[in-house]
Amino acid sequence: MMSTSLLKTDLGPRMDLLEFASTSGSPEPALLAALRTATWQRTRHGRLMSDVHTGRVLAMVSRMVRPRVALELGTFTGYGTLCLLEGLHPEGTLHTVERNDELFPLHDEFWPRAEGHGRIHRHHGEAMAVLENWDPETLGTIDCAYVDADKQGINAQLEALLPLLSKKGWMLFDNTWWNGTLGGPEAATGPKPDALRALNQRLRMDSTLETVVLPVGDGLTMVRKH
């Protein structure tokens, strides 16, 4: 039986559990550890980077799916990019979208040190702009999408993504717990938590999609087309 402490919003037991999970699985690759350190030292928002456990889940999902076309919305310093690259098909392409070009020097420093880095294609701009201009005839249908961009626009991103997915395409949405504040009598309100609640409800009610929320990081929702 699952302990009820796992369902509490109090971060004490949850953080203990996350630390246990992170230290019980495969260790963080050296390149990613170096990028993690650089992110904390050279940016003001290191907390936006995926934790070690989430990164290993992204890498494992990518290895299972073996996408020929992968898409990441919200590159930040490129940590998740390198995790997804680990499982990319040898002939695949990983598209990643970031609007803040001040982060590009970190990409350019660390990505070339990864095997297969030449298959990363960086888009400078807004997530929705890339989705709206995506041409499946030239870029291909998307086998795996990792969504970690503008939370207020996450539902529009979902609707734009769905017709671009391959027949058995996967989507992963980050931060779908929003620090455990989306439910209960003191649930957070505002554009971002409201958008995430709407996303969770939308995914749950769609019979064409199979959805599971993983207790990873700040909540990682995996979605697969039936």
PLM segments and residue spans:
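A short alpha-helical cap/connector motif
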Residues: 1-172, 176-226
